[in-house]
Amino acid sequence: MAIKERIAKLRELMERDGIDIYMVPTADFHNSEYVGEHFKARVFMSGFTGSAGTLVVTKDYAGLWTDGRYFLQAEQQLEGSGIELCRMFNPGVPTTTEFIEKNIPEGGVLGFDGRVVTFGEGKTLSEKLKAKNATIKYEVDLVDKIWEDRPELSKRKAFYLDVDLAGETATSKLERVRKEMKEAGANIHIITSLDDTGWLLNIRGMDVDFFPLLLSYTVVFEDHVDLYVDESKFSDEIKANLAKDNVVIKPYNQIYEDIKGFKSEDVVLVDPARLNFAIFSNIPEGVKLVEKRNPTVLMKAIKNDVEIKNIKEAHVKDGAAHTKFIYWLKELVKSGEIANETELSASARLEKFREEQGGFICPSFDPICGHGPNGAIVHYSSSEETNRALTPNTLFLTDTGANFSQGSTDITRTTALGKISDRMKRDYTRVLQCHLRLSRLKFKEGISGPNVDLFARAPLWYDYEDYNHGTGHGVGFLGNIHEGPAGIHWSIARSVEPFKAGMVLTNEPGLYIAGSHGIRLENEILVKATVKNEYGQFLEFEPITYVPWDLEAIDVDLLTSEDKYELNKYHKEVYDIIAPKLTEEERAWLKEATREV
């Protein structure tokens, strides 16, 4: 069935159900960053395969909203579909909410599957529609009626994290959550975000692309926990571990009926940013809601000593794999064979190096491997259509990561494939200076992202340059690779949570020259407590990624003495930690690649 036919069939169903506008976002029932095959309804209906976008269909119009990462791809994939590309954030382009508000008729009906729309978004739409006496019909998955060969929900087996990996029992975590529930005056807490359930109960799965998470909902009561999940994914051992904490296993979709039984005296703690609109709408009127962030969001962001130890071990494996990869690239340049490789083949080779390390589970996100001008596209995703051959005297940006049994990694390196231009060297060096400034920063407890971001961006700002993305984000422990609540960005709205010892974040400044090259240099960093004195508790960042920077891409004359000290200190650590994991030839290369400057 062609895309035009699918849209026509959708309009037939809309007319049958009295729906004027139907919205299809990119989401699963848990607002996950990546979604499994079953949830790719927007891809099925539009033909657009990018990871972000929303399809809105009226009786005579269809539009696909996506951001700048995907404009070119969307243009190609939407051609001939009858769907207009709506370029988000471009002047004159309304948001989906603004479009719906303007185009819904008086007394009209907006339809969507309320399980894939957040409580917050659904509530906003509901408020906006009141001006036209319009309503929402949220219990309608019209795409499901069209998608005849829709993939089933994942049936992959779950696994359990023992305390030697998790560092804390589920019993202890539940005690902490119930304490916060009590302080909030709540006797029930609904958790729909997969990483929060995974952390709380020490369970993981393979139900979401790139993230080792389990499709599930959790409802925490004062004396037991209801876990809504496909029970066939659990071994007897997992069931026994859950039973110790009075976890009652129920069918995955039963939550939508069960919450209708909440009583008027119940007080329910919900996170509006994570709860889906269908669950919110099924909670009976009269039940009091306490709207605040899930307690687990901050709890899981502060890693315990066991998690930190395991994360560092994962980074040693990742560091060995990525160092082998850079050595492989440099040898291909030396032999004149680099042009035989492409972005996609190099990405596959890097993944193979990771697989060889042992304990590899899967990539932690869709790899970004951009050669030359493709490196200037911040969230570039190589495809058969865009795949470039690697050529000499250019830069190759690789932003990749892995989930190992001990933890998750996220690293970016930009590699010089031979002799590069003075401009490229200058740009690489400035970005490295941004990175080093943040790495060596010492600051007081209570400081948050906007404060430290000013230091990171300064070397570029002095030259009136910048990058249009955050300098850093939190990283989950076998959870989401982009984890809140802390981040590093000058925008207060995006990173207000103060840093706390035990948090793991990224340090990833960049510079992007359209049509020429892109540079991003990323390590993961651990927030560590240092001196405590009459002025307060001081913190610092410890790099926990162990891969050399590219000395062939650095203009040493631009480095300050502090830069050189920090660079040499880091390179000594990289050599000491990674050299034992390499072959004799690789070790000799690494010795030279980490020489003092």
Model-predicted segments: where are they?
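Active-site neighborhoods and metal-handling regions in enzymes and metal-associated proteins
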Residues: 1-597
